[in-house]
A protein has these predicted regions:
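Alpha-helical membrane-protein topology signature
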Residues: 1-136
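An N-terminal, well-structured beta->alpha segment
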Residues: 144-235, 239-240, 322-353, 364
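Gly/Ser/Thr-enriched, mixed-charge loops and adjacent short helices
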Residues: 167-172, 176, 281-407, 415
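Conserved phosphate/anionic-ligand binding catalytic regions in large, soluble enzymes, centered on
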Residues: 172-192, 274, 356, 360-372, ...
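N-terminal small/polar loop signature for handling phosphorylated ligands or for N-terminal nucleophile
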Residues: 217-280, 377-434
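Short beta-alpha connecting loops at secondary-structure transitions
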Residues: 282-293, 321-324, 392-400, 435-444, ...
Length: 680
């Protein structure tokens, strides 16, 4: 028998004490004081306290993280079987053994004996049936392997020893998955956590597809432990015969992508969790083109990780290994030169006349964005000093995400104070940019789709654009595409995620590309890298605002002009977060509901022209878990699980010549999605 049964039995007994005492009071009170029958007294008791017992044992005794509905049904079945077995069999037996005793004494004795038998059967049933799924029993074995490993330091073993059962379960019930976005998770000890051991596993898996003699560039952002994790990755690669080129300072994603191409590396690594909560970190991997890994390569790395003989004993080199080198300033200088080429020619007086407030949100973009704007002639730039320090706790925000307007509260105050024209902000790894515009005395924030549409219009206007290509994703709004068409620019759509946009770029000549962008605030206005770039996007944002200011317009004025020309667009995204194993099951259930109900989901709201199921390869896009509801008026809604966070995302793109009608349809779609998710 598994040795952990003793610990579980002890916790079961402890959580059961209160239930048992309360149950005895209810049962004997109903029987002896209120005169209820034997069966009524015992049934009321166990029905009431079983509900509490389920949640206590689920959380405390067994640390179970599976679906509530399934385990709840098993729990009810278990209670019924235990009750009938304990009390149905116990009463006749006690009545026979105590035949000469008074009836009341015999029935009290039968209830007491039944309770003892019920408790024992209930524990066994819960352990092996209710909460006994294999994945929830295996985590203990993995945990104990870590505790007993000679490769862990004593301080780490002490941390493991202090974990609660629930913490152990969540940290060890699965391995962090490795996909095309790499690996991302909460930092801490365990297979389901980001730590030096899981970093080593990922690095070893990557080394396995490269081979000896390969060359890999490694960057890291300002998140806690990012620099340590980067060095761990370098040590593993070096020990595997791979040359590791490491930055000696915080470096943004676009710089890493550029470096891979500039130094002709075989791949790249960035230690970052982008704009996730402070508790997270991640391991992003790039191919030789500076693009995030494709599905086939990611699958090979995942397979290599699964096949590791000793996950905790992966060989590492010393930090002074000759296979570890540091990247020089010359690479950074070439990157900064390349960023300038992503912009357009604007009058010097236009740049100096624009007032900009910039926040790096404690991330790696600070020096790069400031220097980029300085080189382009933007001399009136105010840095948000409260958010300028490198700090992985991101103390001034809940989440360092420039998609969320709440992070700009300090920047907005400064903008109003000095009368700034625009606010810009980059996330910790500086691949995304968010922006707000001073319009009629207040800051109006641009959505990712609106910024992309403005970029398309500006770049197409300022460059020779006819015949070029705009690359975007299947869940990005249509406004940019419609604007592009008016300039003779073709739009190519790929699966969501910039790796797919960048891979599409690789299929065309660089002079054929106008730009690439997606709705999640990621833009690439040049061809110097193969990932989104918050640094060059900051430059183009400021050049665009400066250009239109010279014409007497804000970017909001320009947006309204585009609405008047192309129609009114509302783009919205709804995200629903579901943590842990139970959350993953819930997300799967939601997608199943929308997929199975299909055409009926929005039938009473808007006529459905087509349901595109990308799991079947719709639009020629590689198979993906995405649904897109195409409506007859040109609007659409889409659903997909996030690839990097425990959430399911819904997208709405509504377009209509009548703004009021567009807003009405948006409200109806949003309410329907929320209702369907709640019921799934």
């Amino acid at each position: 028998m598994d040795k952990t049964i003793y610990g579980q039995a002890f916790r079961f007994a402890c959580t059961g004490v209160v239930n048992t005492l309360a149950g005895m009071a209810v049962m004997f009170g109903l029987y002896n004081i209120f005169g209820c029958s034997y069966w009524v007294s015992s049934a009321v008791n166990y029905t009431a306290i079983s509900v509490l017992s389920y949640f206590l044992n689920r959380k405390i005794t067994f640390g179970y993280s599976g679906k509530v509905l399934k385990s709840g049904i098993r729990f009810a079945v278990n209670i019924a079987i235990c009750y009938l077995a304990a009390y149905g069999a116990t009463k006749p037996l006690v009545m026979t053994v105590m035949a000469d005793s008074p009836v009341k004494l015999r029935e009290n004795a039968a209830m007491l004996a039944g309770m003892c038998i019920f408790t024992g059967l209930n524990f066994l049933g819960q352990r092996f049936f209710v909460f006994g799924e294999k994945k929830n029993m295996d985590y203990r074995k993995i945990y104990e392997k870590w505790v007993e490993s000679p490769h862990l330091e004593e301080s780490e073993k002490n941390v493991l020893a202090e974990m609660s059962e629930e913490e152990i379960s969540d940290a060890f019930y699965r391995k962090l998955s490795f996909g095309t976005a790499g690996m991302r998770g909460v930092m801490g000890l365990g297979m389901n956590r980001m730590n030096r051991y899981t970093i080593r596993m990922a690095a070893k898996g990557f080394a396995g597809i490269l081979g000896e003699g390969a060359k890999v560039a490694i960057a890291y952002d300002t998140r806690n432990h990012s620099d340590e994790f980067a060095k761990e990755a370098a040590r593993v690669l070096a020990a595997s015969g791979v040359k590791a080129l490491l930055f000696d300072r915080y470096s943004p994603v676009p710089l890493l992508s550029f470096t891979v191409r500039d130094l002709k590396c075989d791949g790249g690594i960035v230690i970052t969790a982008s704009h996730n909560l402070p508790a997270y970190n991640g391991f992003k991997v790039y191919d030789c083109t500076g693009c995030q890994l494709g599905r086939e390569s990611a699958a090979k790395i995942s397979e290599n990780i699964e096949n590791l003989d000793d996950e905790l004993g992966i060989p590492v080199s010393d930090e002074d290994d000759p296979n570890i080198e540091y990247i020089g300033q010359d690479v950074i200088d070439r990157f900064m030169d390349a960023v300038q080429k992503c912009g357009v020619d604007t009058a010097p007086e236009a740049a100096s006349d624009l007032s900009v407030v910039y926040t790096p949100l404690h991330g790696s973009g600070r020096e790069y964005v400031l220097e980029t704007l300085r080189r382009a002639g933007f001399s009136n730039v105010t840095l948000v000093k409260e958010q300028a320090d490198y700090n992985g706790d991101f103390p001034t925000v809940r989440k360092p995400n420039p998609e969320e307007t709440a992070v700009f509260y300090i920047a907005e105050e400064k903008a109003k104070e000095i009368g700034a024209d625009v606010i810009i902000g980059t996330d910790p790894d500086s691949d995304r940019i968010g922006a707000g515009v001073m319009h009629d005395g207040k800051i109006v924030y641009l959505s990712g789709n609106q910024t992309g549409a403005l970029f398309v219009d500006f770049l197409a206007r300022m460059r020779q654009s006819a015949g070029k290509k705009l690359i975007t994703s299947i869940v990005t709004g249509d406004m940019g595409q419609d604007i592009a068409a008016s300039y003779g620019v073709e739009t190519i759509r790929t699966f969501t995620g910039f790796k797919d946009l960048a891979a599409e770029m690789n299929r065309h000549r660089e002079d054929e590309i106008l730009m690439a962008y997606e709705e999640s605030y990621g833009y690439l206005t040049g061809t110097h890298i193969r990932d989104k770039d918050g640094i060059s996007s900051s430059l183009v944002m400021c050049q665009m605002a400066a250009y239109w200011k010279q014409q007497g317009k804000t970017l909001i004025d320009v947006l309204e002009d585009l609405f008047a020309e192309h129609g009114y667009y509302i783009d919205d995204q709804l995200s629903f977060v579901f943590e842990g194993a139970a959350g993953a099951d819930r997300i799967a259930s939601i997608m199943k509901r929308f997929r199975s109900e299909g055409e009926s989901v929005f039938a009473d709201i808007c006529e459905l022209a087509e349901l595109r199921d990308y799991s079947r390869g719709a639009e020629g896009v590689a198979e993906a878990n995405v649904l897109k509801f195409m409506f007859s008026n040109g609007s659409w809604a889409a659903a997909r699980p996030s690839g990097t966070e425990p959430k399911v995302k819904f997208y709405c793109c509504i377009k209509d010549r009548d703004r009021e009608q567009a807003e009405k349809l948006h409200s109806l779609l949003k309410n329907r999605i929320e209702k369907e998710v709640e019921q799934a």
